């Protein structure tokens, strides 16, 4: 029999026990992360609503065009991931493997979106006609990707991912690419981005961009998985 005093002394929840302090700190950190994720999800939703409203007011909103952009579709994913992630962080001590796999994919999408926009598309705005609000685009192409990366790097409760989950990152981009190329072929050359239009520099250029971006996505996903395995922090969260 362990004396009552002894049981209190080794109780991991005890305020005097370092492990208990760490558990409470971890729970508090998860709550902070949960609140930030929920705020980010709501903020991104409001940003998209304002962008759509701006287009509607100026009579330039085309739902088919708007919701065909990679940025818009992945932003919708990010809203869901932020909200679900916020709820998980508030209710669970760690994220699920399925949710973390989805986060890994959306992390790669966010970084590629930011890179493509800032390197290729930032100055590709019309000099005449409708001038869209600038800040919603900055939020979706700059600030949200930065927050998503930060969330991956520092948020507690992220399980390590198995390498076999690497291919998940390509499921959505392959489907989106097939849709975009088919849409361009049947809509008289309407492509969401100029680098996907074969009329610009030919199919060789299109294929080069596709291969390059695919390699980039896989590399980013591999880095995310490697980071999750290196810094899972808890052996119970690791996978083989």
Give, region by region, the residue ranges found by the protein language model.
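N-terminal membrane topogenic signal
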Residues: 24-40
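Alpha-helical transmembrane segments in multipass membrane proteins, preferentially the mid-helix core
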Residues: 145-161
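Alpha-helical transmembrane segments of multi-pass membrane proteins
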Residues: 40-56
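Membrane-interface loop-to-helix entry segments
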Residues: 71-74, 134-146, 207-211
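Membrane-interface transmembrane-helix boundary segments in multi-pass integral membrane proteins
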Residues: 67-68, 187-223
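Non-cytosolic membrane-interface motifs at loop->transmembrane helix junctions
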Residues: 61-69, 98-101, 126-139, 162-166, ...
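Hydrophobic alpha-helical membrane-insertion segments
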Residues: 110, 166-179
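Juxtamembrane "helix-exit" motif on the non-cytosolic side of transmembrane helices
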Residues: 51-60, 118-128
């Amino acid at each position: 029999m362990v004396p009552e005093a002894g049981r209190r002394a080794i109780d991991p929840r005890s305020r005097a026990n370092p492990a208990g302090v760490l558990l409470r700190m971890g729970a508090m950190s998860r709550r902070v992360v949960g609140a930030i994720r929920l705020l980010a999800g709501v903020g991104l939703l409001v940003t998209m609503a304002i962008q759509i409203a701006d287009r509607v007011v100026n009579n330039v909103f085309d739902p088919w065009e708007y919701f065909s952009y990679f940025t818009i579709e992945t932003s919708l994913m990010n809203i869901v991931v932020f909200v679900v992630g916020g709820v998980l962080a508030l209710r669970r001590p760690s994220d699920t493997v399925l949710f973390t796999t989805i986060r890994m994919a959306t992390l790669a999408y966010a970084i590629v979106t930011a890179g493509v926009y800032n390197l290729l598309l930032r100055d590709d705005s019309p000099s005449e006609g409708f001038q869209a609000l600038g800040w919603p685009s900055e939020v979706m192409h700059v600030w949200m990707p930065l927050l998503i990366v930060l969330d991956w790097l520092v948020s507690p409760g992220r399980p390590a991912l198995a390498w076999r989950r690497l291919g998940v990152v390509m499921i959505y981009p392959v489907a989106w690419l097939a849709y975009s190329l088919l849409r361009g072929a049947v809509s008289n050359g309407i492509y969401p981005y100029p680098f996907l239009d074969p009329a610009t520099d030919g199919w060789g250029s299109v294929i080069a961009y596709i291969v390059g971006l695919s390699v980039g996505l896989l590399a980013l996903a591999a880095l995310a998985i490697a980071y999750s395995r290196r810094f899972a922090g808890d052996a119970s969260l690791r996978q083989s």
